[in-house]
UniProtKB/Swiss-Prot annotation:
Belongs to the mycobacterial PPE family. This is Uncharacterized PPE family protein PPE24. PANTHER family: GLUTAMINE-RICH PROTEIN 2. The lineage of its organism: Bacteria, Bacillati, Actinomycetota, Actinomycetes, Mycobacteriales. It comes from the Bacteria. It comes from Mycobacterium tuberculosis (strain ATCC 25618 / H37Rv). One of its GO terms (biological process) is response to host immune response. It holds the Pfam family Pentapeptide_2.
């Protein structure tokens, strides 16, 4: 049994339905006891022999005894060690079983899943349960995967434990001094030879009494083995029918040394026992005596556990209906399995009695999902089948349709070969009877590919008499008028508040980017070029009117959360060198903007803008990173050529009257400053400074008037006192400053306060060179968080209005010339910025109330052509630019979450179509004329003849050879009209990749019976709902689903 293809119903049920770890624990205890006994025996044996040798027994015989006893003592000690190791491996196996029992899915969960699926499928009238069915199936697939994973781990662990066991070495077989004929182990043969009785030449002779037996000494039919008495036994020394094993007395037992019917195990006495050493019926476990016990070493009825005596509760399981059920979900009596209907079932999901397998409909079945009685194999429809997927009785082979077939995929009876269609065929792929060869069509063929079929079709001599057809009167008839009623399409409104669920955009990570060092070639020269003039043609926009009263329901835009953005620290590469370059002069031509006039009388209907609420915006506190370092750098000299500014005319400007408030300057006191004596300043001289004459052109100021200015209080300057100081040198220089003639003006009278300058000296003043070097460090600073409260903009109502015609005059801009600008070569310093992390920014949802768009009509609009004159650009040279390698760090954009939002409601008005009437159509009566067909003579002729050569079957189109008729598919079929591989029977089909099946009109793999759909199905008109690659485990009559047995399960009345 391959657990990887079994559904979780079987895998979980097998794990939970067995005897559990108790038998293995008992075995571990027994091995421990055996190890102790062997060690004690070895010590005792050694002690006895040592005592004998060291005591009164002396001499050569004593030495010989000691030498002969030593290997036995060593064997006993080694066997004790091996028994102890075996006990340890048994304990490890118990741990493995407990682990798999914990890992597999509980059977009740699997049953609940399947029940939910059936309920959803039966109520899925309009497909509304499709998502729920998909979810149930997905959960079931996960259960399947969990069970297969657990069983794989269990298989691996159990295999490792089993491989660690070492076989026990055999003790010495012979003792010294025995005669040769006795030491050889064949005393009877030796005595026979000594007596002179001759032996039969050629060895033993195997004689079978019956039909279609394979092996020797069998009495009955279709046995495969030795010394079986009965029918369809697969094994040796069985007495009964349908046994798979050895030395069984009874029928349909799977195992060895059983007495009874339908036992799955060994050494059982009774009916329907699952396990070993049970006496009674429907016991599950080891060493039970009674009925319906689950566990080990129980004596009684319906007991659950180990080593109990008595009668259990009416039902010791859960969900049972009946008496003495120790399993769960049973209906009946003495059921120790789960989900059974009947009496004494130790397997699961059976309907009937004393079934030790699973999913059977019938009695005494040791296999699984059979429909019938006493089946040892799987998916059989019939009785006493030791093979699998058979339709019929007494078949030791598999996928047969018929009876007493010991081969496979046969259609017929008593076939010992494979893929035969017929009776008593010993060879393979034969059509017919008693063929011992292969691929023959016919009877008693012994070769290969013999037997052909010839056909000829001949018509007899035939004369047809004349045929008189009288006239036929057809009465008048009229088709009534047909009126199609008017069709009313009611108003439709989309459901309100269609909600779009929240979704998240996943995070996006941009990998780091490596930009290698690059240097542009020096002195790239770009020749002068001109951009051609561009003319935009005139544009005609026709008149357009929007439909009136478009209604848009209120809707809300969901809140949008922008995740925090991490900008990693970045450092520009040091010493990026940019060579000197010159930008050529650029002349922008004058631009003519023609006069434009908007169309007159643009009408905008009245409309209302709904209230708009802007939610409050929280700008969290932000802190610039500390220690932003900008290294020192040097800007090259920059030459800015002269710029000619055209005359600018400023229109008259009028400044209104204004008042200056009173200005109060407080008294300022400078304390006395004392410079210590003894400071010496060396002499120095200033060179002559020549300033060229500065000419200020005539400035014309238009006539303007100033209003009277008044002071509220008298204005006087405060007293300023400067203490005396001295300058110990003479300062002489000359300057030529031309006379400056200020324009005329007048001031009102004011008074200066007393101004006194004391004697003072100016010391030598030295200003040392000062260089501002980098780095310049700007410390961190903190911006506190601030909140902007929500702003409510109330609804604005605008009545209809008409935009007047607006005319703008033509505008012409003069040419503007930018002379060339020269920049010397310079080096950009390295700049380092610390890592910056921006906090999350949340924009709350914005709600907009429903509103109606008015009807808007715009007249046709025509724009005049717009011409852009050519632009001339002189040639210039690009400098050489060198950039070092640049590597950008990865940039990660976190996921963006968008909450659900609601779509507005849209309404369409009702539509009614007018009725349609088709007028009546009338046809008048008429009579057909009589017709006479003269006699016809058809002479005898041969239409055709053909011959089918010998081969496997007739009219087969399968890829591989098949027997039978009209078979197709992969091949290896027998019977009639089968399509697939390994099929027998009539009109069966299995999908590509599946193998086997028998019966009539079945579709699926590994099935038998009549008109079944699905894989792993037997019986009549059953339907499995699992994929064809998975066994649905269905038997019985008219069942729909999986893990079903019985009648009409999973259907509606």
């Amino acid at each position: 049994m391959n657990f990887s293809v079994l559904p979780p119903e079987i895998n979980s049920a097998l794990i939970f339905a067995g005897a559990g770890p108790e038998p293995m624990a008992a075995a571990a205890t027994a091995w421990d006891g055996l190890a102790m006994e062997l060690a004690s025996a070895a010590a005792s044996f050694g002690s006895v022999t040592s005592g004998l040798v060291g005591g009164a027994w002396q001499g050569a015989s004593s030495s010989a005894m000691a030498a002969a006893a030593a290997p036995y003592a060593a064997w006993l000690a080694a066997a004790a060690v091996q028994a102890e190791q075996t006990a340890a491996q048994a304990a490890a196996m118990i741990a493995e079983f407990e682990a798999v029992k914990t890992a597999v899915v509980q059977p009740m969960l699997v049953a609940a899943n399947r029940a939910d699926l059936v309920s959803l499928v039966m109520s899925n009238l309009f497909g509304q349960n499709a998502p729920a069915i998909a979810a149930i199936e997905a959960t079931y697939e996960q259960m399947w995967a969990a069970d297969v994973s657990a069983m794989s781990a269990y298989h691996a662990g159990a295999s490792a434990i089993a491989s660690a066991l070492s076989p026990f070495s055999k003790p010495l077989q012979n003792l010294a001094g025995l005669p040769a004929w006795l030491a050889s182990g064949a005393p009877a043969a030796a005595m026979t030879a000594a007596a002179g009785i001759p032996a039969l030449a050629g060895g033993p002779t195997a004689i079978n009494l019956g039909i279609a037996n394979v092996g020797g000494g069998n009495v009955g039919n279709a046995n495969n083995g030795l010394a079986n008495i009965g029918n369809a036994n697969l094994g040796n020394y069985n007495f009964g029918s349908g046994n798979f094993g050895n030395s069984n007395i009874g029928s349909a037992s799977l195992g060895n040394n059983n007495i009874g019917f339908g036992n799955l195990g060994s050494n059982n006495v009774g009916v329907g026992n699952l396990g070993n050493l049970n006496t009674g019926f429907a016991n599950t476990g080891l060493g039970n005596f009674g009925f319906g016990n689950t566990g080990n070493n129980n004596i009684g009825i319906g007991l659950t556990g180990n080593n109990q005596i008595g009668i259990g509760g009416l039902n010791s399981g859960t969900g049972n209906f009946g008496l003495f059920n120790s399993g769960s979900g049973n209906v009946g009596f003495f059921n120790s399995g789960n989900g059974n209907f009947g009496i004494g079932n130790s397997g699961n999901f059976n309907t009937g009695g004393w079934n030790s397998g699973h999913g059977n409909t019938g009695f005494f079945n040791a296999g699984s999902f059979n429909t019938g009685m006493l089946d040892v194999g799987n998916a059989n429809t019939g009785s006493l089948n030791t093979g699998s997927y058979n339709m019929g009785d007494f078949n030791p082979g598999s996928s047969n349709t018929g009876t007493f077939n010991t081969g496979n995929a046969n259609t017929g009876f008593l076939n010992a070969g494979n893929i035969n269609t017929g009776v008593f065929n010993i060879g393979h792929m034969n059509n017919g009877l008693f063929n011992t060869g292969d691929m023959n069509n016919g009877v008693f063929y012994r070769g290969v590919g013999q037997g052909s079929l010839q056909f000829s079709i001949t018509t007899p001599d035939l004369t047809l008499p004349p045929l008189q057809i009288p006239g036929i009167s057809v009465p008048a008839f009229s088709l009534p008028a047909i009126t199609l009623p008017s069709l009313n399409i009611p108003a439709a409104t989309t459901p309100a508040n269609i909600t779009v669920g929240a979704f998240s955009l996943p995070g996006l990570t941009l990998p780091s980017l490596n930009i290698p060092a690059a240097t542009t070639p020096a002195n790239i020269t770009v020749g002068a070029f001109s951009l051609p003039g561009l003319t935009l043609p005139s544009l005609n926009i026709p008149a357009a009117t929007t439909p009136a009263n478009i209604t848009v329901g209120a809707f809300s835009l969901p809140g949008l959360t922008l995740p925090s953005l991490n900008i990693p620290a970045a450092t520009t590469p040091a010493n990026i060198t940019v060579g000197a370059f010159s930008l050529p002069g650029l002349t922008l031509p004058s631009l003519n903007i023609p006069a434009a006039t908007t169309p007159a009388n643009i009408t905008v209907g009245a409309f209302s803008l709904p209230g708009l609420t802007l939610p409050s915006l929280n700008i969290p506190a932000a802190t610039t990173p500390a220690n932003i370092t900008v290294s020192g750098f040097q800007l090259p000299p920059l030459s800015i050529p002269s710029v000619a500014i055209p005359p600018v005319t400023v229109p008259p400007i009028t400044v209104g009257a204004f008042n200056l408030p009173p200005l109060q300057i407080p008294e300022v006191t400078i304390p006395q400053l004392t410079i210590p004596a003894g400071i010496t300043i060396g002499g120095f001289s200033l060179p002559a400074i020549h300033t060229q004459p500065i000419t200020v052109g005539q400035i014309g100021v238009g006539q303007f008037g100033l209003p009277s200015i008044g002071w509220d209080v008298f204005l006087s300057t405060p007293r300023i006192t400067v203490p005396a100081f001295g300058i110990p040198f003479t300062l002489q220089f000359q300057t030529n400053v031309p006379a400056l003639q200020p324009p005329g003006g007048g001031l009102s009278t004011f008074t200066n306060g007393a101004l006194i300058f004391g004697e003072f000296d100016l010391p030598q003043l030295v200003v040392h060179p000062y260089t501002l070097t980098g780095p310049i460090v700007i410390g961190s600073f903190f911006l506190p968080a601030f909140n902007i409260p929500g702003i409510d903009v109330p609804a604005i109502n605008v009545d209809g209005f008409t935009l007047p015609q607006i005319t703008t005059p033509a505008i012409t801009t003069p040419e503007f010339a930018i002379p060339p600008i020269g920049v010397g070569g310079f080096t950009l310093p390295q700049i380092t910025t610390q890592e910056i992390i921006t906090p999350e920014l949340t924009i709350n949802s914005i709600g907009v109330g429903g509103f109606t768009l008015p009807q808007i009509t715009t007249p046709p609009i025509t724009t005049p052509p717009l011409t852009i004159d050519p632009i001339n650009l002189t040639g210039f040279t690009l400098p050489q630019i060198t950039t070092p390698p640049i590597t950008t760090p990865p940039l990660t954009i976190d996921p963006i979450n968008l909450t659900g939002f609601t779509l507005p409601q849209i309404t369409t008005p009702p539509i009614t179509t007018p009725p349609l009437t088709i007028e009546p159509i009338g046809v008048g009566g008429f009579t057909t004329p009589p017709l006479t067909v003269p006699g016809i003579h058809l002479p005898s002729t041969t239409i055709g003849a053909f011959a089918i050569p010998g081969g496997p079957g007739y009219f087969n189109s399968s890829t591989a050879p098949s027997s039978g008729f009209f078979n197709s598919g992969a091949g290896g079929n027998s019977g009639f009209g089968n399509n697939g591989s390994g099929l027998s029977g009539w009109f069966n089909t299995n999908p590509a990749g599946l193998l086997g099946g028998s019966g009539y009109q079945n579709f699926g793999g590994l099935s038998s019976g009549f008109s079944n759909l699905g894989s792993g199905v037997s019986g009549f008109a059953n339907r499995g709902i699992l994929p064809f690659s998975v066994a649905s485990v269905v038997s019985g009559f008219a069942n729909i689903g999986t893990n079903l047995a019985g009648f009409f399960q999973g259907t509606t009345s």
